[in-house]
Amino acid sequence: MNQGTIIKVVGPVVDVEFPSGLLPNINNALHISSDEQPEDKKTGHDFKVVLEVAEHLGGNIVRAIAMSSTDGLMRGMVVTDQESPITVPVGDATLGRLMNVVGDPIDEAGEVPSETRWPIHRSAPTYVQQNPSKEILETGIKVVDLLCPYVKGGKIGLFGGAGVGKTVLIQELIRNIAYEHGGYSVFAGVGERTREGKDLLVEMRESGVIDKTSLVFGQMNEPPGARMRIALTGLTVAEYFRDEQNQDVLLFIDNIFRFTQAGSEVSALLGRMPSAVGYQPTLATEMGTMQERITSTDKGSITSVQAVYVPADDLTDPAPATTFAHLDATTVLERSISEKGIYPAVDPLASTSRILDPRIVGEEHYEIARDVQEVLQEYRELQDIISILGMDELSDEEKLTVARARRIERFLSQSFFVAEQFTGNPG
């Protein structure tokens, strides 16, 4: 087994020297375990730190990024090259379980009993293997299926502020895919608040969708290496269900912006020259490498729903702008709609879909969707007049438009199965 020694530790960055001719490859996993240390380096407490090789510095030295805290590491400690990238458990054993970036369970329910482990760095399906789908993924959510339908194997951006219903919408999607399609879901919490992750886990257990879901979390308090790689861990779990079990999988990434943010931190730690607005120069490459793995193949599909945080509401910021290039549909949640008590609070005019096309959804569906948007657009234009002068100042035709629009709004709202315990209304 190839072993080296630590020669420098600066925060989450660790430099390791290996014997001549035995340098580990880029992206290889390195393990530092308390069991393998010489007597003079034993600290009295057990630990296991996983590093990932990021650079070869010359002179048989590699620079690696830690996936957990480097507290307790010191120069001279023994490091073991695993001779492969980080591997994580995959398969049915991961369903209902909560794991971290290196596949260790963090739900205190014992080891994940999976015999199969896959590396998190994998190549995207080839041209021949890809099977671009034009098939609609029926979600059972009226406003989505009518106005911004999701494509099987597509990527959907979910935009929304705090408290407008992103989490409930995600849970309903997971529930509907599990019950109506018999499919599996994978939830990757990227730079999540730990409290929100805990809430989601409890709610999933109560609503009964946990048995069809694998969860992987790299919380806000984790080092940037873990937050940068946790999306790949979730994606690898989803790829196994797609490629080995021929499943149509739903992959949730919340929040894709944190993936970019963590990459920016790692880039700065490695001393790379920053690009526009301080982001890493490899931003487009990192995003593309991950997004290209989310696709339909001749075996199954991965449909991805990604929550997108927009810094300072600036859509031209390089992080959201790079994400937009990969999306097939956008679902925008609007606070003004949730304030009316209309849930899901999807904005029917701001939400878009690439497959809302008469050649794919059919002429009738397309015409109805456009007519609905036309009525809602007219209603929006009349709202200023209504708020200032009142309904009495409208013409009979305009009053009819308002009545139609309000009925459409109510029709496009619905009770969710997963919210039944809170609302008392059946889904």
UniProtKB/Swiss-Prot annotation:
CDD domains: ATP-synt_F1_beta_N, F1-ATPase_beta_CD. InterPro entries: AAA+_ATPase, ATP-synt_VA_C, ATP_synth_F1_bsu, ATPase_a/bsu_AS, ATPase_alpha/beta_chains, ATPase_F1/V1/A1_a/bsu_N, ATPase_F1/V1/A1_a/bsu_N_sf, ATPase_F1/V1/A1_a/bsu_nucl-bd. Its main location: membrane. PROSITE patterns: ATPASE_ALPHA_BETA. ATP binds at residues 160-167. It comes from the Bacteria. Its EC number is 7.1.2.2. It holds the Pfam family ATP-synt_ab. One of its GO terms (molecular function) is proton-transporting ATP synthase activity, rotational mechanism. It catalyses: ATP + H2O + 4 H(+)(in) = ADP + phosphate + 5 H(+)(out). F-type ATPases have 2 components, CF(1) - the catalytic core - and CF(0) - the membrane proton channel. CF(1) has five subunits: alpha(3), beta(3), gamma(1), delta(1), epsilon(1). CF(0) has three main subunits: a(1), b(2) and c(9-12). The alpha and beta chains form an alternating ring which encloses part of the gamma chain. CF(1) is attached to CF(0) by a central stalk formed by the gamma and epsilon chains, while a peripheral stalk is formed by the delta and b chains. This is ATP synthase subunit beta. The gene is atpD.
